[in-house]
C-alpha cells in the first residue's frame, strides 16, 4: 500500500495478477468438481483459493479470485466459459438496438458472490496483507461484449466504434457507471486497492484511445472511493502510456514489452 501511495518502501513489493491457478493442487481439486464460473460464484471456495495462493507464494498482496467478465451477466449478456475456447458471449452487441437492450448494473446484489468472497478473504488473510479487488476496464469489457469472446483483430469492436459513435459511447458510459458501483462495492467489502485490467487496449492507436476510450476510463477512475489506490494496467500500451496516465491511476501497470530503465 505504501508503494501504491509512492512512499518509501524497503523493497519492491511483488504480487501476481493470477495468483490462484492450475499450479495449485487445491485449485485443481476444486476445479475437478465444478466449472470456473461456479468457482467464481462460490464465495467460500473463491476466498479459500485466494488465501491459499497468497500464503503459498509469499507475496506482498492477495488479489481476489474472480474474473473481469462477471459484471457483464447482470447487463443481460449470456456468458459461458467453454473448455478450450475461453469466454463466449452468446448474445454479443453489434448495433445501437443491441446497446439499448443492455441493462444498468445498479444493484450490487447481482454480484454479491464477489463481495462475499472479498469479505471472507479479508477475514482469513493476515491483517498486514493487503487485498486487491479488480475489474475489467471499459474498452476491454466492451471488446468482449461486441466480439462475443476473445479476438485477434477486433473487427466488430472497431466497426461499431467507427460507424456508430453514439452507440459506442452509450455502451461505454453504461459500462463505466456499472464499474464505478462495482469497484466501490468491492472497496466497501474490504478491498484496500483496486486494479483496472485493460488487457486489449493495445489494439488501439493513440488517437482512437483519446477519442473513444479515455473519457470513459477516466470516469471510472475518478469515481473510485477517494483514498483507495487504483492500479491502471494494460498490455501492448507503449504508445498509450501518456494517455493512460491522463486517464488516471495511482499506479500505471507496464507489460513485458517495456524496459523499466527507459521510463520515468
Predicted region positions:
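A gly/proline- and charged-residue-enriched helix-loop-helix capping module
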Residues: 84-124
Amino acid at each position: 500500500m505504501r508503494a501504491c501511495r509512492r512512499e518509501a518502501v524497503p523493497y519492491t513489493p511483488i504480487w501476481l495478477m493470477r495468483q490462484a491457478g492450475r499450479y495449485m493442487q487445491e485449485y485443481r481439486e476444486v476445479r475437478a468438481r465444478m466449472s470456473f464460473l461456479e468457482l467464481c460464484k462460490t464465495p467460500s471456495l473463491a476466498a479459500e483459493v485466494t488465501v491459499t495462493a497468497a500464503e503459498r507464494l509469499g507475496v506482498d498482496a492477495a488479489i481476489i479470485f474472480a474474473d473481469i467478465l462477471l459484471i457483464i451477466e447482470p447487463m443481460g449478456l449470456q456468458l459461458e466459459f467453454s473448455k478450450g475456447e475461453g469466454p463466449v458471449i452468446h448474445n454479443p452487441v453489434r448495433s445501437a438496438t443491441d446497446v439499448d437492450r443492455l441493462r444498468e448494473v445498479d444493484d450490487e446484489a447481482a454480484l454479491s458472490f464477489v463481495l462475499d468472497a472479498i469479505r471472507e478473504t479479508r477475514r482469513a488473510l493476515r491483517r498486514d496483507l493487503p487485498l486487491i479487488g479488480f475489474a475489467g476496464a471499459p474498452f476491454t469489457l466492451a471488446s468482449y461484449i461486441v466480439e462475443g469472446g476473445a479476438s485477434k483483430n477486433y473487427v466488430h469492436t472497431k466497426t461499431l466504434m467507427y460507424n456508430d459513435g453514439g452507440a459506442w459511447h452509450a455502451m461505454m458510459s453504461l459500462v463505466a457507471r456499472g464499474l464505478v458501483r462495482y469497484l466501490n462495492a468491492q472497496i466497501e467489502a474490504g478491498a484496500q486497492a483496486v486494479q483496472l485490467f485493460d488487457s486489449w487496449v493495445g489494439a488501439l492507436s493513440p488517437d482512437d484511445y483519446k477519442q473513444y476510450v479515455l473519457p470513459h476510463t477516466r470516469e471510472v477512475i475518478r469515481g473510485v472511493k477517494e483514498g483507495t489506490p487504483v492500479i491502471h494496467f494494460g498490455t501492448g500500451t507503449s504508445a498509450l502510456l501518456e494517455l493512460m496516465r491522463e486517464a488516471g491511476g495511482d499506479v500505471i501497470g507496464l507489460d513485458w514489452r517495456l524496459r523499466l530503465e527507459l521510463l520515468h
